[in-house]
Amino acid sequence: MTELTQKIGHYRYRILALVFMATTINYFDRSIVAVMAPTLQKLFDWSNKDYAAIMVSFKIAYGLGLLFMGGIIDRLGTKIGYTISIVIWSIFGMLHAAIRPAFSLIGFIVARFGLGIGESGNFPAAIKTVAEWFPKKDRAFATGIFDASTSVGAILAPFIVGAIVSVNGDNWQIPFLITGLLSSLWVVLWLKTYQKPEVHPKLSKEELAYINSDSEEETTEKIPWVKLLPKRETWAFALTTLTDGVWWFYLFWGAKFLAEQFGVNIQNIGLPFLIIFIMADMGSLLGGYTSGALIKKGWTINKARKITMLVCAIIILPVSFVPVIASKWIAVFLIGLAAAGHESWSINGYTLVPDVFPKKAVASVIGIGKMLGVAVAIIADIALGAVLDTAGNSGYFWAFIIAGSSYLVILGFVHLLMPKMTPLDDNLNYIKN
């Protein structure tokens, strides 16, 4: 550690660690039902249609919640807004454990809906936290660190749940209670630790100056989301979130595809998923580091972000060939490579918002974009299910073609909408250099 680094300090990374913890809990909680799906379906006599209704309930709530949770976080501030989000998902997460067999379907639909509302606040709050605590040149890397925790949560879920829950469903309630307790612990740590950098008593003057080194002065007036919708920059970011459906395809349909294509079962799905999500984590960290390093070398933010996203789009292309590959491990590698590219794409896409918008609009813009991404993911799930029912496994061919090619197409439209990434001031007017 250099003398300059010691002088500046690193308290901002304590805040980032809490965001990492929250996002890990978020994805672990989200993955529990998917991991236990075969056991729960047998235990509660659910049909596939019943299970689909539970999943769609979560996604609908998540999409709707993204719209207003972002606004709540912008209006109430990051500290209170993030707390409200995780308290909601803690309550509904633990509510799963109280559901009785006679009301299992409606109970899980309600619980997943509430969970979706609460969890929808995580990413808007996390991005806003990074915008408040990191200078622009470090935001992509910081976003990459916390975004990597999505894979951590997805990796931990099958191992922890498998160690607790028996094959016949004994102890199925315990994972929901564990996540509720972890979330409660997080709330205590968050309320004790978080303040805005400008008023935080443990932040050095040198670190505060570093955080604000490339930030503009802003007013405290909040920007209504209706004023954000006409901005091309809002829709440029929203387009990048359309790829969320691809990520959820890997997360929720990946195990099913590997089972039907390569005979992978619940006992040996762990290693393929471990490889895929570790690669995703590596992509998340590398993507954030790369664009940040390019900015530090003198590249414009516009060039650094878009070139990094272009590289991501290119390395994702080979996943289109997965349905025609005979080797399970080559298929796993290509899915992992695509997951890595997606995570790198995603964190650079997120940082477009604080790069362009004032801090007070960040959570709302993120919420608008993510809501659109979830809506597309819901439509994609319905369409894929229908195609698989009518055309069989050949439906995966088109799913992977879209998953592989969509990033390049979307990046082209992002550049058309936002060719120069000119920053906006508090009144959403362009800041002239």
Residue ranges and their predicted role:
Residues 56-71, 274-287:
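Central cavity-lining transmembrane alpha-helices of secondary-active solute carriers
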Residues 111-151:
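Cytoplasmic helix-loop-helix junction between adjacent transmembrane helices
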Residues 140-162, 166, 280-284, 370-380:
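Glycine-rich segments within core transmembrane alpha-helices of 12-TM secondary carriers
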Residues 284, 354-390:
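A late C-terminal transmembrane helix in Major Facilitator Superfamily
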Residues 146-198:
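Helix-loop-helix hairpin linking two adjacent transmembrane segments in secondary transporters
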Residues 33-34, 230-287, 342, 346, ...:
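Extracytoplasmic gate region of multi-pass secondary transporters
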Residues 64-105:
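Conserved MFS/SLC helix-loop-helix module at the cytosolic interface between two early adjacent transmembrane helices
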Residues 87-102, 310-326:
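C-terminal ends and interior cores of transmembrane alpha-helices
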